[in-house]
Amino acid sequence: MASHILLVGIGGFCGAIVRYFFSRKLNSGKLPVGTLTVNLSGAFLLGAMAGANLSTTTTLLLGTGFLGAFTTFSTLKLEMAQLQLKKEHRLFILYTTITYGGGIALAYLGYWLGSFFR
């Protein structure tokens, strides 16, 4: 059990740092491209991991840990609320559509591609 917690912690530490860099580099305009990038790529990678049926150790380190901290639901919701409050309705709809539609599509694509590595 302690080794599982350590794996999740190490992965989470690394994932959070990588997400921080994406946000700092890409979230400079009206549309939060950094958050969009980490959430879409995270959906794809987690789908690929699930499709590949990786070991528990790898899943804890990379899936639960790294990708759990790399992707962000709370920041997404905050940014969506901010777009609405700033009356950026078109950007809100675009951001929401790309995030949810793209996330589901990329998770499915990742799962399908990952299944070739079983």
UniProtKB/Swiss-Prot annotation:
Coiled-coil stretches noted in the UniProt entry, renumbered to this chain: none
InterPro entries (UniProt xref): FluC (IPR003691)
Locations listed in the record: Cell membrane
GO CC terms, sorted: plasma membrane
Membrane topology note: Multi-pass membrane protein
Keyword Transcription: no
Pfam families named among the record's database cross-references: CRCB
Bilayer-crossing regions: 2-22, 31-51, 56-76, 91-111
Assigned keywords, A-Z: Cell membrane, Ion channel, Ion transport, Membrane, Metal-binding, Sodium, Transmembrane, Transmembrane helix, Transport
Taxonomic superkingdom: Bacteria
Example GO molecular function: fluoride channel activity
Sites where the protein binds Na(+): 68, 71
Function in brief: Fluoride-specific ion channel. Important for reducing fluoride concentration in the cell, thus reducing its toxicity.
NCBIfam families found in the cross-reference section: crcB
Protein name in UniProt: Fluoride-specific ion channel FluC 2
